[in-house]
Structures are given as C-alpha cells and as structure tokens.
C-alpha cells in the first residue's frame, strides 16, 4: 500500500509540473500584455464594438471594474434562477428557486465558491446549469486570475500608477486560456463516458423490476470548467462521486490535474515575469511540502479507519464508508486534499464520512486560506500575502526594512496584508459561533456532539474561503444558513481581493531596489522553511481551539473509548 501511495503522489506531481511549466510561460505572455498575433484583429474588433478603452487602470479603478462586473453577474444569475420555471431547456419542468436559495446559489457561483444547498438533478434546468452556473464558472475563475495578474505586475513594475486593464485581462484569460483547455478536457471526459446531451431524464426498469430515473444533461462541458476553474459545483448532487460526472479512475486523475494546473502554472508565470524563475520555484516547493504531508496524513487516517470495526468482526478497519469502490482509499484521500488545498470543493466521496482526523485535514487546508496551490489566481495571491508576512517577520528579526523582489514593504502594505489574512478567519469563527448559539443554527445539526460542531465549522470554513465542499450532515437549505453562508462567501471573496489590489497599487508605485548584502534571499531552503512555518503558525494560532472542540475531540472519543 505504501508503494502504491508513493507512485500515485509522485506520478501526479510529475505530470502536473510537466503540464504547468509550458502553460506558465504562456500565462506570462498574457501578464506582460502580449496578445496572440492571430487574434489581434479579433480583439481590436471586440473593443470597438464594446466601446471599451484599452487604457490601463490604477488599483481602485481595477477593483471597481472587478466588483461591478461580478455584481452584475450576481444579479443576472439570481434572476435566471428565480424564473427558470418559465424559461426553455427545462424538460423536467423544474420551478424557480426560492429567493433565499437563489440568492445563496448566485453568490456562491459568482464568488467561485460553488456551495450547493440543493441537488442539481432535482432542482435546476439545463438552461440554469449552462447559461447560469457554467458561465459564472468561467467568469469567476477569470476574475481570480486577473487579480493575480495585477499583483504580479505590481511586483515587477517600477514607479507605475497602473496595474493593467481589468476588461482586457478577463477577456484574454477566458478566450485564450479557460475556453480552449476546457474544450479539450470536456472532449476527453466524453470519450470516457461522461454525459453530454439535452435529453429528458430516462425512466428505466432495473433487473429486479423496479423503476429508476436516470438524469441526463450537458455534464461534460460543465465538468471541465468546474475543475479547471477550481469551481467545484457538481451537475449532480453527489458531485464527482457520480459515475456520470467522473466515470473512471483516469477521469479522476485528470480532474485532480485540472484543479492544480492553473494555480501551479501561475507560480511559474510569477517567476518568469519577475525575472527570477527560482522565486516561482520556491512557492511551488512550499506548496508541495504542505500538500504531500496532508495527503499522507489523510491516507494514513482512512487506512487506519475505525478501531471498533474489528471488535464487531470486520476483517478490516479501513474506512470505506462514503467512498466509491472504483477509486479506492488512496485516490479518494488524495482527491479530498487536492480539492480543499485548492478552492475547488468538488468531491468524489462524502467528506462527512471520513474519520475525524481524515476530515480535519481538508478542513484545515481551507482554514489556512487555501494557499497550497489554491484556487485559480486566489491561491497565488493568497500565498504571496504570506510571503509578505514572512519577509516582514524576518525583517524584524534581523533589524532591516522588509523587502521582496526589490520592493520595500511599508506599514500600509502590512496593514492591507493583515486585513486580507484576517478576513476569512474572522468570518469562520464568528459565523460558527453565531450558528451554534442560535436555535435556527442548531436546528440544522443532525449529528449532535463534536461531529455536529465539526459540520458547522466545516460549512463556515468552506464558505468563507470560497471552497464549496461540505460535511453533508448539516441541513443548510434554510433562510438562516442560506443568508449566513452567502454573506461569508461574498465578504470572504471580495474582502480579500480589495486589500490585494490595494497592495498591488502600493507596490507598483515603488522603485525596485537592487539586492544588497543584507537582503534576505527569498528562494532558498531557509526562506521556504520560514514560509511554511508562517503558514502553519497562523493556522495553528487561529484555529487550534476550534479544531480541538470538533475533530480532535471526536478523534479522541473514537480511539480512547472502548
């Protein structure tokens, strides 16, 4: 089993790096503003038709463009979900959603969270899935990448007042990156058996003579961008555990690769644009170290399973509850880490059925800000926030003004960094406290005790950090949870984006100083260790008390009771 685990992790990382390196070089061209020569005229025609100026923006103009663009998308998606009952491409005749569920779902997909308080095959029409959710899968992903582009430019520009043009960035990211790669992935999924049709649901008779309904729909096209854009919202309720979404071990492997592909490629892009590839390599090393350790811990926990099973006569303690036999323990454990290290949230098993320790690791990966590769764009700018915090701490220790890539890090930068890092923990802890201290919050908990608290903590961690996965034992389709989680998702998304863009505006205006004898190298093993330690320390100080009340207590109850 250990050899199989090693081969799975090693092969995944090898293929990921081989694919991410050339994509990173291509993304670097987009960051530096180089359009594809073949599409230069197409771009010019689009801007003429839209009446859009190609002039660059300062940070607050960029932020306003991103914010208004997403608010418009939220309003349109909300209207579509409310009125789907009277719109076409609804062969099952599903009615419109309730206002609170429609609002929660609209916020969820606009913020790249894809939290789902519903089951897609029994709630949404094909039009809502395609024109609503799938469109936002592209646009929310493009938003995150665009913000990362702006921050990368800020580190590399000298005495500049602008960080790029939001409209051009979103357009190029969608047209040149997300659409073509999604098309290739969708075709591969179709070849493996993923559904792609517009048929009404099929009613069949099983071998036992019972009647069964098989859901249909344009699944593969949505599945591709769901993974590539680290969105995570499934066409079906059980997400990638459904054989119509994720039919084979090969599609499972490709889905994991798709989740990490752009976040890893952006690290290469960062190093290339900065003029020092080793800067990007250092980020990849730091992310990979945390990722591999997390995978090993979850695999160990799920293989150790439940010690009480052997007492009941079971031949094995391995925890297969809630898992698909076609994937097995190792691939399922790795998928759970990939999807929560990134802000994806897609699942190929029920995380609520993991062991206490196995479920705690995905929860913790979300709580540290999903900076282990992370979401498309958000993973990189989230990790760069920790980089700024690390160089600030290192500067305090050696008595020098902190700097990164030749840019001095001043008080304003650190205030914005602290604000961005503290937004999501505040939402998680205060939201969890509100849920468990009110009757309407406690009413949704189906499993009392430590695990019930873990379900609430997981839900708020997932929403605030824009992940979207869940512990299924919590009833969240209520006005209380729909509104609470929608607030956490929106503030968790834009409450981080705005400080990041403010940092970008501050950094791009500064001169880039040459490195001196006392400059801290930000690419070697020492800095990688400091960066990993900072991420772990912030996560530990913030969430250990809450984790002790939930998964840690549950783990001790399981292993110390007879």
UniProtKB/Swiss-Prot annotation:
Q: Give yes or no: UniProt keyword Repeat.
A: no
Instruction: Give the stretches traversing the membrane.
Output: 6-26, 62-82, 132-152, 170-190, 253-273, 283-303, 327-347, 356-376, 379-399, 416-436, 483-503, 526-546
Instruction: Look up keyword Ion transport and say if it applies.
Output: yes
Sorted keywords for this record are:
Cell inner membrane, Cell membrane, Ion transport, Membrane, Potassium, Potassium transport, Transmembrane, Transmembrane helix, Transport
From the UniProt annotation, give the residues forming the signal peptide: none
Please report the record's description of how this protein sits within the membrane. Multi-pass membrane protein
Q: How does it assemble?
A: The system is composed of three essential subunits: KdpA, KdpB and KdpC.
By sequence similarity, the record places it as follows: Belongs to the KdpA family.
Q: Please give the name of this protein.
A: Potassium-transporting ATPase potassium-binding subunit
Instruction: Tell me the organism.
Output: Serratia proteamaculans (strain 568)
């Amino acid at each position: 089993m250990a050899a199989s685990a090693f081969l799975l992790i090693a092969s995944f990382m090898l293929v990921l790096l081989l694919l991410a390196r050339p994509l990173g070089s291509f993304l670097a061209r987009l960051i530096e503003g180089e359009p594809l020569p073949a599409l230069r005229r197409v771009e010019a025609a689009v801007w003429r038709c839209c009446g859009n100026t190609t002039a660059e923006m300062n940070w607050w103009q960029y932020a306003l463009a991103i914010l208004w663009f997403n608010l418009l998308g939220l309003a349109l998606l909300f209207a579509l979900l409310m009125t789907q009952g009277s719109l076409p491409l609804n062969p099952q005749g599903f009615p419109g959603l309730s206002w609170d569920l429609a609002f929660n779902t609209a916020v969820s997909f606009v913020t790249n969270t894809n939290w789902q308080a519903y089951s897609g095959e029994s709630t949404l029409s094909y039009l809502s899935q395609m024109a609503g959710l799938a469109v936002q899968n592209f646009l929310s992903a493009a938003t995150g990448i665009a913000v990362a582009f702006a921050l990368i430019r800020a580190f590399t520009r000298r005495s500049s007042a602008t960080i790029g043009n939001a409209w051009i960035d979103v357009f190029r990211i969608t047209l040149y990156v997300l659409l073509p790669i999604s098309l290739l992935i969708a075709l591969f999924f179709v070849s493996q058996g993923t559904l792609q049709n517009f048929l009404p649901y099929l009613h069949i008779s099983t071998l036992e003579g019972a009647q069964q309904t098989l859901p249909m729909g344009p699944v593969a096209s949505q599945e591709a961008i769901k993974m590539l854009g680290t969105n995570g919202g499934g066409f079906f309720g059980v997400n990638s555990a459904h054989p119509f979404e994720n039919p084979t071990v090969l599609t499972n492997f490709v889905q994991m690769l798709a989740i990490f592909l752009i976040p890893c490629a952006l690290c290469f892009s960062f190093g290339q644009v900065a003029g020092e590839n080793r800067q990007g390599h250092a980020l990849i090393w730091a992310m990979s170290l945390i990722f591999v350790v997390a995978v090993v811990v979850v695999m160990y926990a799920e293989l150790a399973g439940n010690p009480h099973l052997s007492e009941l006569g079971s031949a094995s303690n391995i925890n297969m509850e809630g898992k698909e036999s076609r994937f097995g323990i190792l691939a399922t454990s790795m998928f759970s880490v990939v999807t929560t290290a990134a802000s994806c949230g897609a699942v190929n098993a029920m995380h609520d059925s993991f062991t206490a320790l196995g479920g705690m690791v995905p929860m913790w990966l979300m709580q540290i800000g999903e900076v282990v590769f992370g979401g498309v764009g958000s993973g990189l700018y989230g990790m760069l926030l920790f980089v700024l915090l690390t160089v600030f701490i290192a500067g305090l220790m050696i008595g020098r003004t902190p700097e990164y890539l030749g840019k001095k890090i001043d008080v304003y930068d650190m205030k914005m960094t602290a604000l961005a890092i503290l937004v999501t923990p505040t939402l998680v802890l205060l939201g969890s406290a509100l849920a468990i201290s009110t009757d309407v919050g406690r009413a949704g908990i189906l499993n009392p005790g430590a695990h019930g608290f873990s379900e609430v903590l997981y839900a708020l961690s997932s929403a605030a950090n824009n992940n979207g996965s869940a512990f299924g034992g919590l009833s969240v389709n209520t006005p209380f949870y729909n509104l609470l989680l929608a607030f956490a998702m929106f503030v968790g998304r834009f409450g981080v984006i705005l400080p990041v863009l403010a940092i970008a505006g501050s950094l791009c205006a500064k001169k880039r100083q040459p490195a001196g004898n006392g400059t801290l190298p930000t690419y070697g093993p020492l800095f990688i260790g400091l960066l990993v330690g900072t991420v772990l320390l912030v996560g530990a100080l913030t969430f250990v008390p809450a984790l002790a009340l939930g998964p840690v207590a549950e783990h001790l109850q399981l292993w110390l009771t007879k």
